[in-house]
Amino acid sequence: MFVDLHAHTGGISTCCKVGADKILETAKEYGFDGLAIANHYVRNYFTEETYDSWIEKYIAEWNLCMELGKEYGLRIFKAVEVTMEYDKRLHMLIYGADEAFLRNNPLLCDKSLAELYGICKENGCALIQAHPFRSGATVQDANFLDGIEINCHPNYQISYADRVMEIAQKKNLMVTVGCDYHADNYRPCGGMFLPEELKDGKDLVNYLLTAKEYHFQVHEPQDDRIYQASFRRETQEILA
């Protein structure tokens, strides 16, 4: 199945231009079989006093997407995009998170990368650095990452796919692909080709952490080119 591993909805991500229903409707129209809903988790969305009520809204948005997914025939995976408070250029995608994870681990954005990675490992989650070169950012310490993302958002000018795969190969990291879709530009057609039997976030994490080869499609924002590729932790190959 073809899954965009990085999508937002307007119910939580205030920079997203439309609500969950339109996000899923558009994904279905563009041929996706599933989405990872990774709304922003950023410090200016809450205070320590309002965290509990805000996180319930975050969870409710996940659940709304799960219900809409049934209507549209889309597999929905729960994910989180954490903006690191110590350097707001750094956004970390968490796959495998669920309601208990968010309720039991507050203020993730205030953690160091090492602390966040430790929390993810304790809870069976995978930690991926999103758009690792945006705004002059660099790939962070691979000891505290499971992977790095090829990001197809049209506002980012280039996906850095070759660079991401080269670094991932050297550092034995996984590669994920997502469009970071906010409905603020055209709908890119980038994502991962995943086994149909993946039913939820834990299945997704198990696959991402154990697969030796990943197959995906990149929608290159620089020239609107769409191509498929595969990545092995030792080798990488452009298919077509």
Mark where each language-model region is.
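Binuclear metal-dependent hydrolase catalytic cores centered on His/Asp/Glu-rich metal-binding motifs
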Residues: 89-123
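Active-site-adjacent beta->alpha loops and helix N-cap segments on the catalytic face
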Residues: 57-58, 106-115, 158-166
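Surface-exposed amphipathic alpha-helices with a cationic face
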Residues: 2, 28, 66-70, 112-128, ...
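An N-terminally biased module of ancient metal coordination in phosphate/nucleic-acid-related enzymes
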Residues: 1-78, 83-85, 143, 185
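Charged catalytic cores and adjacent phosphate/nucleic-acid-binding surfaces used
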Residues: 1-5, 9, 13, 19-25, ...
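Conserved beta-strand positions in the central sheet of alpha/beta enzyme cores
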Residues: 36-37, 128-129, 149
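Short, flexible loop segments at the rims of nucleotide/cofactor-binding pockets, characterized by
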Residues: 11-14, 54-55, 103-107, 126-128, ...
